[in-house]
Amino acid sequence: ADYLTLGLRENGRNSTARILNFHLARNPEIAFLWNMADNYSNLLNPELSISCPFILTLTLVVEDQVKTHSEANLKYMDLEKKSKTSYAKWFPSVEKEAKEWGELRQRLGSGQSSVVSYFLNITAFCKDNNETALEVEQDILNSFRKNGFELISPRFNHMRNFLTCLPFMAGKGLFKQLKEAGVVQRAESFNVANLMPLVADNPLTPAGLLAPTYRNQLAFIDIFFRGMNNTNYNMAVCGTSGAGKTGLIQPLIRSVLDSGGFAVVFDMGDGYKSLCENMGGVYLDGETLRFNPFANITDIDQSAERVRDQLSVMASPNGNLDEVHEGLLLQAVRASWLAKENRARIDDVVDFLKNASDSEQYAGSPTIRSRLDEMIVLLDQYTANGTYGQYFNSDEPSLRDDAKMVVLELGGLEDRPSLLVAVMFSLIIYIENRMYRTPRNLKKLNVIDEGWRLLDFKNHKVGEFIEKGYRTARRHTGAYITITQNIVDFDSDKASSAARAAWGNSSYKIILRQSAKEFAKYNQLYPDQFQPLQRDMIGKFGAAKDQWFSSFLLQVENHSSWHRLFVDPLSRAMYSSDGPDFEFVQQKRKEGLSIHEAVWQLAWKKSGPEMASLEAWLEEHEKYRSVA
């Protein structure tokens, strides 16, 4: 009486599902097409959503225009007459009704509108037990009631309502039966059009990282897809600790590696170590990095300015060198290369500057000699016997072009800011050169995690260099993903020029959970950056660890969408950047386990019941597959 039972047979087993139907009891007071999806998946109140498979059906028939026009005329004349008698004193609403019917008859007479008979029904499918059915019923009734839609269950008539969701059934006498039962509503065509069950969520790309929308629609993220009106493939990600940044980015890295491309990750905190080892990548600690600015040069005319810029940033991280400094430095770079080519060192550059300072050429130019002496002092720390000489005068640089994945852990350099700036800029130059030298159909990815620390450059030259690199990477199928903990690190007056350049030149922007206090301050300073709905939505984002999924806002140029990312327990273990998880894996590695075995044990430790259910499901389906 209160439901239908559907019998199914799958893999040699019988199973049943329960079918529940609900239809509209009366016309809603107000309805908008853009708000219709909130009836079954409310953005701000996710608990007001339908959590089971369902079919929402709108069956409509446009009534005869002449008949409805005549009906409107009669109705208007009757109400208009009553409104001018004592009847209106007892029923004050009659004047409003007369006005509405008068306007309706004008629209009907001019052909601007029509009267439509319609039947709105929702058919839900759930497990065949009373407890689940009651939960589904309450979900549906409460979700629609939130927006002013009153639904009722068709007692003893579930089969009739169920048939309406099947194709071509309404025209075979079923709609007439619905009319006779009094469950068909009437409204103007405009109002009925606003009841259409449309979901406007964008599926984004045909394939890629699966990230369902908040409306529970399939959506995929592929930053290299060309159909999103994006001007580049770069992505900026910001979210507080525990928001799920690492779990979101690591699948993107895997997709690039699986396509045959390469990825380089700048990290602080060993967050990508497990993934690197699982994927057979190269893991390098910042303390062991070795560079040589002249190592990969083949044409000094094309590379001289790049090396000059690198040495300029190393000499003055805050960007205090002027054009004369840089002109002299360019001469030193060219002279060093012409003398020793790839065997040239920073010592050769400093020697050239010393000889120039002592030469007769600048004997009468104390200003020039002063600049030469300044650069000699600033670059001395990077010579072979200088404080940081071991990092920049290597015969065999640490970075090799044959590695598909390289993770560079730079946390050990954080307490030496000058060295960190020099290393970071050298790495960015290396990445850009590798992107340019490899085939353009090969996907390339550079991930800069903890960008608020790694991109904290005061030197405007670094910002300009990053902006240029971010803009030109698209031509070589390259992408930069920059990650910070707070949107202020990207988009505020406090952000460095490099961070602002990364934000401004990223077509993809992902906003995860934010610090409530910091986000409120940001919205006060920049009230036009986010709409009220977006602020409320971001404020409701939870921690990925607590809710078992990541919530985020994806912005691609002017398009915005809301997504959730669900990750299986094995991937969660591999992607985890939590301290205890990291120590667990490292301890298992010391005990002799492989990285795969260590991650497997961590997955069982963190998500035992989930892993057990997945294994049981796999064994069951493998058994039936072998029987078939």
Language-model features, listed with the residues they occupy:
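Hydrophobic positions on the alpha1 helix immediately C-terminal to the Walker A/P-loop
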Residues: 248
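Conserved lysine of the Walker
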Residues: 245
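Extended, folded cores of ATP/NTP-driven motor/assembly subunits in large transport
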Residues: 1-195
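Walker A (P-loop) phosphate-binding loop of P-loop NTPases
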Residues: 242
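P-loop NTPase motor domains
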Residues: 46-49, 61, 65-67, 162-219, ...
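Hydrophobic anchor at the beta1->P-loop junction of P-loop NTPases
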Residues: 237
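Post-Walker A helix-loop "phosphate-sensing" segment adjacent to the P-loop in P-loop NTPases
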Residues: 254-264, 279
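A short helix-turn-beta junction within AAA+ P-loop NTPase domains corresponding to the substrate/partner-engaging
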Residues: 280-284, 496-511
